[in-house]
């Protein structure tokens, strides 16, 4: 049984790494961000608009956080991916990984991933990050820029996807060996 959470800002590479880890180890993959995106779709608003709405309506975040926590509690082998997820599930996971990269690189990645002009990607990302930081401080008293809760922080600026995965894999293998023998063998 292993539970791993990936957090970090948009475009950092956290989703890429979380999905790779889930696939490699045969773990369930859960995205808290997909809940937020689905909520936006149901409401017929963009992510940045939902972020603005969530500044005034805490029930949005609280519901997503509740669903994330329940999913992790009810799962044995799972990888969780979310900007703020690590703070929500901190006490019930085996490994907390923070993935980051400089803003310029993250904007380029977001624009490429979403097929969005750079200016729009920058505006949307800044709005989302500001809104998330403010909401989490207000609702939980947590500063998402304080990464001291994480077991591993990895900056993807100078390393590729495979190099980052190998670093993460080495830590996971160590944890699995200590817990109950390696799942990757």
UniProtKB/Swiss-Prot annotation:
One of its GO terms (molecular function) is ATP binding. GO terms for cellular component: cytoplasm. InterPro entries: Cyt_kin_arch, Cytidylate_kinase_dom, P-loop_NTPase. GO terms for biological process: pyrimidine nucleotide metabolic process. It catalyses: CMP + ATP = CDP + ADP; dCMP + ATP = dCDP + ADP. Its EC number is 2.7.4.25. Pfam families: Cytidylate_kin2. Coiled coil: none annotated. It comes from the Archaea. Gene3D superfamilies: P-loop containing nucleotide triphosphate hydrolases. It is found in: Cytoplasm. ATP binds at residues 8-16. Keywords: ATP-binding, Cytoplasm, Kinase, Nucleotide-binding, Transferase. Its main location: cytoplasm. NCBIfam families: cyt_kin_arch. Belongs to the cytidylate kinase family. Type 2 subfamily. This is Cytidylate kinase. It comes from Desulfurococcus amylolyticus (strain DSM 18924 / JCM 16383 / VKM B-2413 / 1221n).
């Amino acid at each position: 049984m292993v539970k791993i959470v990936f957090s970090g800002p948009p475009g950092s590479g956290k989703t890429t790494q979380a999905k790779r880890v889930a696939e490699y180890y045969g773990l369930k993959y859960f995205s808290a961000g997909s809940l937020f995106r689905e909520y936006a779709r149901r409401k017929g608003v963009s992510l940045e608009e939902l972020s603005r709405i969530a500044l005034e309506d805490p029930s949005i975040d609280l519901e997503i956080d509740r669903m994330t926590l329940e999913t992790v509690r009810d799962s044995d082998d799972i990888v969780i991916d979310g900007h703020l997820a690590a703070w929500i599930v901190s006490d019930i996971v085996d490994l907390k990984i923070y993935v980051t990269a400089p803003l310029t690189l993250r904007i380029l990645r977001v624009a490429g991933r979403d097929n969005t002009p750079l200016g729009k990607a920058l505006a949307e990302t800044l709005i989302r990050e500001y809104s998330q930081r403010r909401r989490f401080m207000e609702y939980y008293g947590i500063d998402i820029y304080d990464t001291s809760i994480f077991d591993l922080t990895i900056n993807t600026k100078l390393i590729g996807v495979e190099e980052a995965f190998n670093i993460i894999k080495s830590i996971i293998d160590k944890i699995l060996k200590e817990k109950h023998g390696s799942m990757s063998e």
